[in-house]
Regions:
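N-terminal, positively charged/glycine-rich alpha-helical extensions of SAM-dependent methyltransferases
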Residues: 1-24, 170-171, 181
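Core SAM-dependent methyltransferase catalytic element
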Residues: 211-234
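Hydrophobic beta-strand segment of the Class I
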Residues: 23, 121-122
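Class I SAM-dependent methyltransferase SAM/SAH-binding core
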Residues: 53-110
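A short glycine-rich, Lys/Arg-flanked "PGG" loop and its adjoining helix->strand segment in the class I
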Residues: 134-149
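Conserved alpha-helix/loop element of class I SAM-dependent methyltransferases that forms part
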Residues: 32-50, 67
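C-terminal alpha-helical "lid/dimerization" subdomain adjacent to the S-adenosyl-L-methionine
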Residues: 10-11, 81, 153-207, 211, ...
Length: 234
């Protein structure tokens, strides 16, 4: 089990080290810009208030942190956590003008923060890349304040049969698209594989509940291409 976890950690790190320079561009192209709409809906449901504290895990290029800061008129304290060196550097540089945002390199399974610290914990398109999802959820629960909220945005299972057939066919061309734009298809073959192997909405709902969260619910976006899961620390 330990070797399997270590292998996945190395694989994921290698994937992001290959795509970091064109990460945002590929996201825009692959989703036809939809990922930006989904992220805004994510923040709308979150509805953060002034002076809230956020830990955003697997922050990538900093989209969620930036939207959270905008929602709170920059009157919030945001902690971005990113395990990959190259993604960390790009994200930190992207948000260098935000005095309320701090960056740390760490894994979702081992957060360097005290318990009961944050009002919100977010992870956007990152949870399926985590080597030990149960441990990551336990860490999320630990660092949230009582009454704090866990929110996850992730690719999920399409709930419309016709759309799903189109989606599956489109998914098969994404590695070729990646090779043309990034220069290698490997990261995008991993992307499609990781999406197909990840939990359904209902399965992930159960996993979140089993790791101690209360009032868990989810919402589908674009017929389940992506889904938002929410849970509370009570």
């Amino acid at each position: 089990m330990k070797n399997t976890i270590q292998d996945k950690t190395k694989l994921v790190n290698s994937v992001f080290s290959k795509v970091y320079k064109k990460y945002d561009l590929m996201n825009d192209i692959m989703s036809f810009g939809s990922h930006r709409i989904w992220k805004n809906k994510f923040l709308d449901w979150m509805n953060p208030q002034l002076n809230n504290t956020l830990i955003d895990v697997a922050s990538g290029t900093g989209d969620i942190a930036k939207l959270f800061s905008k929602k709170t008129k920059n009157n919030s304290q945001i902690t971005c956590v990113e395990p990959n060196k190259e993604m960390y550097s790009i994200g930190k540089n992207n948000l260098k003008n935000f005095d309320n945002i701090k960056w740390y390199r760490a894994s979702a399974e081992n957060l360097p923060f005290k318990e009961n610290t944050f009002d919100f914990y977010t992870i956007s398109y990152g949870i399926r890349n985590v080597s030990n999802i149960n441990q990551a959820l336990k860490e999320a629960l630990r660092v949230l304040k009582p009454g704090g909220r866990f929110m996850c945005l992730e690719f999920s299972k399409v709930d419309n049969e016709i759309l799903n057939k189109i989606y599956q066919k489109y998914s098969k061309i994404i590695p070729s698209l990646g090779k043309y734009i990034v220069g290698t298809s490997d990261p995008y073959e991993y992307l499609i594989k990781s999406i197909n192997e990840f939990y359904s909405q209902e399965e992930f709902f159960d996993v979140i509940c089993k790791n101690g969260f209360s009032q868990v619910e989810f919402r589908n976006l674009s017929n389940g291409i992506s889904a938002i899961h929410s849970g509370w620390k009570i």
